């Protein structure tokens, strides 16, 4: 038996995880995976095998690393001869087709679906920095980025990468669900270049030019900042500073791709 799954976005795969949780007497003894990149799946679609025949066990998880540098859009999972699979995870990084984005089209340059990602934060006690780029509004506080309460001088920060180079025209800061624990203020710095480890990038970010000067925030609110932005040219990275600490649900950087 087999099934075809379309990925949420095109991406470069680094590994697959086949999970047979709860399938103890009806799991498939074997499996293999094929991939392709295509707008439409039809009988003429060319599939590429990227894993060997895998041996599976019941109520188990198997991770298979792969090296496939070409972006893919679909996965075909074969199970031998039949049975049940609880989850298939496809690990990798988003790699959008930027030719499909118009020169004058305004998009969220930091969106997860566009390749935006969190790099590092000084604190992720209650929520991961990567949540800032997720689609939609946060479903609860745990679906955002929140730091512990700061008992020492200073402020908290997070560094993120845009999907590609872009000119930011509007910043949207959403503090959904954060009512007594939202940051009092925030600011944003930006840069076209960054290199090295996450820790090295964090050190570089301290001196990046200011994109959004320090502004006040409200609880459980979608803030739009456009006229407050400074012109620092196209950027690829940002540092979000929150004063002194707290939680932010989503960060949107609306603008145009710079090719």
Language-model-detected regions and their locations in the chain:
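Short, surface-exposed beta-strand/strand-loop-strand elements in extracellular ectodomains
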Residues: 24-38, 181-194
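Predominantly extracellular/luminal cell-surface or secreted proteins
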Residues: 19, 34-38, 91, 174, ...
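Disordered, acidic Ser/Thr/Pro-rich linker "stalks" and the adjacent N-terminal cap
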Residues: 1-6, 24, 93-163, 179-181, ...
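Beta-sandwich interaction modules
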Residues: 10, 48-84, 155-157, 162, ...
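Acidic Ser/Thr/Pro-rich low-complexity disordered segments
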Residues: 39-48, 104-107, 194-209
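Edge beta-strands of jelly-roll/beta-sandwich modules across compartments, strongly enriched
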Residues: 83-100, 246-259
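A short beta-strand element within beta-rich, extracytoplasmic domains
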Residues: 11-25, 77, 166-178, 240
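Exposed beta-strand and adjacent loop surfaces of beta-rich binding modules
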Residues: 13-15, 28-30, 85, 168, ...
């Amino acid at each position: 038996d087999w099934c075809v799954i379309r990925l949420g976005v095109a991406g470069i795969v680094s590994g697959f995880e086949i999970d047979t949780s709860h399938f103890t007497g009806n799991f498939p003894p074997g499996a293999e995976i094929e991939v392709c990149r295509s707008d439409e799946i039809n009988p003429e679609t060319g599939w590429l095998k990227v894993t060997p025949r895998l041996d599976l066990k019941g109520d188990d998880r198997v991770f298979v690393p792969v090296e496939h540098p070409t972006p893919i859009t679909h996965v075909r999972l074969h199970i031998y001869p039949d049975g049940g699979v609880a989850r298939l995870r496809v690990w990798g990084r988003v790699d959008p087709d930027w030719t499909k984005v118009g020169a004058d089209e305004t998009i969220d340059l930091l969106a997860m679906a566009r390749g935006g990602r969190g790099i590092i934060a000084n604190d992720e006690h209650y929520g991961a920095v990567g949540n800032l780029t997720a689609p939609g509004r946060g479903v609860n506080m745990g679906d955002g980025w929140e730091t512990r309460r700061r008992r020492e001088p200073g402020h908290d920060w997070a560094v993120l990468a845009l999907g590609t180079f872009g000119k930011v025209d509007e910043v949207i800061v959403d503090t959904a669900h954060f009512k007594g624990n939202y940051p009092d203020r925030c600011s944003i710095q930006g840069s076209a270049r960054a290199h090295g480890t996450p820790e090295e990038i964090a050190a570089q970010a301290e001196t990046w030019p200011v994109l959004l000067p320090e502004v006040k925030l409200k609880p459980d609110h979608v803030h739009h900042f456009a006229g407050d932005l400074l012109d620092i040219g196209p950027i690829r990275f940002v540092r979000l500073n929150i004063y002194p600490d707290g939680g932010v649900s989503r960060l949107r950087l609306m603008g145009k791709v710079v090719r």
